[in-house]
């Protein structure tokens, strides 16, 4: 069973992602801060991380950099999730090197296709 770490501080968004992923047979781990996301990624080495960008504490981009900077977690695919889709935000996400970008509200078909594609690619 593949494991997906969801790093999201919005309870409704967390529940939606968790419910959709679990219904498709994925195991989920949950973090509500960037620091907690980095810790869970390091301890559990999930198959994929879904990373909100606007988080309390360190933001999603900094959490992503810490995950990529650790030899034990650098190969884990990370998807940026954000409601902020301005050109400046998109270019910051692209420049950081995320494996994919999904806007909110989540398009369920695109969400599941992205998760499946990145886990299979891994």
Description of each model-found segment:
Residues 8:
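Conserved acidic carboxylate
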Residues 14, 56-59, 74, 86, ...:
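The feature encodes the CheY-like receiver
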Residues 25-32, 40:
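Short hydrophobic/Thr-rich beta-strand motif most characteristic of the beta2 strand and flanking loop
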Residues 15-23:
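Charged docking surfaces used in two-component/phosphorelay signaling
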Residues 52, 82:
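Active-site residues of response regulator receiver
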Residues 39, 61-74:
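Short amphipathic alpha-helix used as the core "switch/output" element in two-component signaling
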Residues 106-116:
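C-terminal output helix
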Residues 12, 33-36, 59-65, 110:
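Acidic catalytic/metal-coordinating carboxylates
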């Amino acid at each position: 069973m593949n494991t997906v770490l969801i790093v999201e501080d919005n309870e409704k968004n967390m529940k939606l992602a968790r419910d959709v992923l679990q219904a498709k047979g994925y195991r989920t781990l949950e973090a509500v801060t960037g620091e907690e996301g980095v810790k869970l990624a390091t301890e559990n080495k999930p198959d994929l991380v879904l990373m909100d960008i606007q988080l309390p504490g360190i933001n999603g981009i900094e959490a992503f950099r810490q995950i990529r900077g650790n030899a034990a977690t650098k190969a884990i695919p990370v998807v940026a999730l954000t409601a902020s889709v301005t050109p400046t935000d998109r270019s910051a996400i692209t420049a950081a090197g995320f494996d994919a970008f999904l806007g909110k509200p989540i398009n369920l078909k695109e969400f599941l296709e992205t998760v499946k594609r990145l886990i299979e690619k891994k």
